[in-house]
Each structure stands twice: as C-alpha cells, then as structure tokens.
Amino acid sequence: MEDQVILVDEHDNKVGFAGKMAAHQRGALHRAISIFVFDSHSRLMLQRRAAGKYHSGGLWSNTCCSHPRPNEESADAARRRLREEMGVDCELKKAFSFVYRTKFGSGLIEHEFDHVFFGNHDGRPVLNPDEADDWKWVDLTELTVDVRKRPETYSFWLAACLDRVISCRSLNGAGAAAQKIGSTITLMA
C-alpha cells in the first residue's frame, strides 16, 4: 500500500489524507518535516538523496526530510525518520515552519507545510541506501555561497529555507538547538 500524507490547509489544520504520489501529482498542500543536525563546530550534516528517489534524487539536501504518517505528530515523525534515514538519534527542537510550492521537471509538484527541527550530534551517520547515498559536514557560510553558485546541486527546500535556518541559529546561539519561533514563511517557485 502506498504511503499516505496528511493534507492540510494554509494554517496546517488537517483536512484529510492522500497517497504520497497522488498528492505530489496534484500539488496538494501536505505536512512535511525537515531536520537540520549540527555538530559541536556548528557544521550542518548534509545528505545526498539517493539517485532512485521519486524526485530530487542525487541532490544535496538537509540532514533528513520526510512526511509524518497519518495521525503521527510532526516531532515524532522527525525523530523516527532521522533514525530510519540516517541512523542518528538526538534530541530535536522545533525551529520554524514554512510553506513552499515548486514544480519538478518530472511534472511532480511539491507543495508542503514544512516543520523544521534542529538537533545536535557529533557522530557519523549510518545511511539507509534507499534514502541517501552520501553525507558530509558543511560550514553554513560555505554552504550559502555554494547554494548561490550551484543551486542545481541542492534540493529546492534547502535553498528556500537556508537563510531562515542561519537566522534561527544566530538568534538562539550556535551551540544550542533553536527554540520554537512560531512563525511561518511562504515561498513559491
């Protein structure tokens, strides 16, 4: 059976469920999670999405991104997917949310109400090869420069929220996970 996603309205209120592919074919707004894990040197753990992913395969992205299951809280989904994709178990804190919509060359449309979580971890990940085929630690300043220079090598959502990630890290101290800021930004492409 196909994975289900939680359909939401513009305020993140649940309005139903849909198959993951159907939601992406229709461009239906659905709930998502994005996780950013930092080490003690304030470097971000990036993953390269597995080539076989249904979209954005082979692109560098944030540590982990996925969708909550029906009736699963976003924070619980974030912890679960971080373990499943990257083999990392760490405390996660909600940082912010944002909404974005973009169309891929394949015709799929990503339209997500994305809940962003921050965590801290110094160990090496254990990659699930179905999800990610490489990883690296990267300095945020270097990442910002590279995303602007070579945007085609990064996932849309990473590039879309990177400035907000940096802002939240600055507001809350580089060594600590961000506290919930409670605001939502909207980005369309």
Swiss-Prot record:
GO biological process: dimethylallyl diphosphate biosynthetic process; isopentenyl diphosphate biosynthetic process
Subcellular location, record wording: Cytoplasm
Entry's cofactor comment: Binds 1 Mg(2+) ion per subunit. The magnesium ion binds only when substrate is bound.
Keyword Manganese attached: yes
Keyword line: Cytoplasm, Isomerase, Isoprene biosynthesis, Magnesium, Manganese, Metal-binding, Plasmid
PROSITE patterns given in the database record: NUDIX (PS51462)
Catalytic site: 65, 112
GO terms assigned for molecular function: isopentenyl-diphosphate delta-isomerase activity; metal ion binding
Swiss-Prot/TrEMBL catalytic activity: isopentenyl diphosphate = dimethylallyl diphosphate
Record pathway: Isoprenoid biosynthesis; dimethylallyl diphosphate biosynthesis; dimethylallyl diphosphate from isopentenyl diphosphate: step 1/1
Keyword Metal-binding among UniProt keywords: yes
Pfam families attached to this UniProt entry: NUDIX
EC numbers for this chain: 5.3.3.2
Cofactor(s) required, per the database record: Mg(2+); Mn(2+)
GO CC terms of this entry: cytoplasm
Domain Nudix hydrolase: 28-160
Chief location of this protein within or outside the cell: cytoplasm
Residues noted as binding Mn(2+) in the record, renumbered to the chain: 24, 30, 67, 110, 112
Top-level taxon of the source organism: Bacteria
Binding residues for Mg(2+): 65, 85
Annotated family: Belongs to the IPP isomerase type 1 family.
Primary role: Catalyzes the 1,3-allylic rearrangement of the homoallylic substrate isopentenyl (IPP) to its highly electrophilic allylic isomer, dimethylallyl diphosphate (DMAPP).
Name of the protein described by the UniProt record: Isopentenyl-diphosphate Delta-isomerase 2
